[in-house]
Every structure is written in structure tokens, then in C-alpha cells.
Amino acid sequence: RMQKLQTAREEIPKEDQYTLYRDGEVLVLGFGSVKGTLLEALDHLEGVGYLHLRLLWPFPEIAPLLEGKTLVTVEHNYSGQLADLVQQETLKRVHHRVVKYNGRPITLDEAVAALKAVKEGRAPKRLVLRKGV
């Protein structure tokens, strides 16, 4: 199983493993279905970047992109599994976990409000989105 991961890392081009859509002092990391909402949210935010992961193990390649940033993960799960993986594999601290686990998609309003709160220093370390409950 681990050999498959190594083979994927070697054979999948870097541009197909992750995409940095915009850099910023606040860097959001996401995976899967959060992409569309987060890309749209960037239009409403300054100083916020987005790194979209398409392969769950683009490590250690992304580590330099995380240097000196306020790191935020946005996820559709309870515990913030992507944040755990990023921290484990890059040794970089994820400062904020934005999570939603009620089965509803993250809305543009929720994403913008959460990321503004992070940028302004008002966000808790774990922010649970609840719209649509």
C-alpha cells in the first residue's frame, strides 16, 4: 500500500498534485469539494491565499509554501483530518481549523466570514460552521 503512494508521488506531475491559486499571509488549505467555494471567497478577501490539494500526500513538496503563513484548513469533517495530516507531514502548525460536518456544503457567506475572522484575529482555533442545520 505504501509503495502505491510512493509510485503516485513519483508518477503524478506536481501540477496535478496541488495548486496554489493565490498566495497570502493567511494560507488556506483545502481538499475536494471545498475548492469552488474557497476560490469564490478569494474574490472577497485580501491577503488570503488558497492551496488546493488534489493528492493527499504532496509532502514534503508543499512545506516551503507554508513557511511564515497563518495556516487554515477548511474541511467537511468533524476533527479536521487534513490539518492533522499537514502538521504531521510538514511539521508546520495549522493555526485554525474551519470545519462543517452537518452534511451541508460550506456556503460562500460562511467561508468569507470565517476567513475574515481569521485575518482579523477573531477566530478560535477550531471554528464550526453550522448554516443549514
Predicted regions and their residues:
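Catalytic-core signal marking the mid-to-C-terminal active-site face
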Residues: 1, 5-16, 47, 51-60
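Generic secondary-structure signature for well-ordered alpha-helical cores
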Residues: 3-10, 43-47, 91-92, 116-124
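Glycine-/acidic-rich phosphate or pyrophosphate-binding loops and their flanking alpha/beta elements
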Residues: 6-27, 39
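Solvent-exposed alpha-helices and their adjacent loops that cap or buttress functional pockets
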Residues: 18-23, 63-66, 88
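Short coil/turn connectors at secondary-structure junctions
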Residues: 22-25, 46-48, 67-69
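Conserved beta-strand elements of the Class I
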Residues: 27-29, 72
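Generic long, charged, amphipathic alpha-helical segments
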Residues: 33-65
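Peripheral docking tails and interdomain loops at the edges
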Residues: 71-133
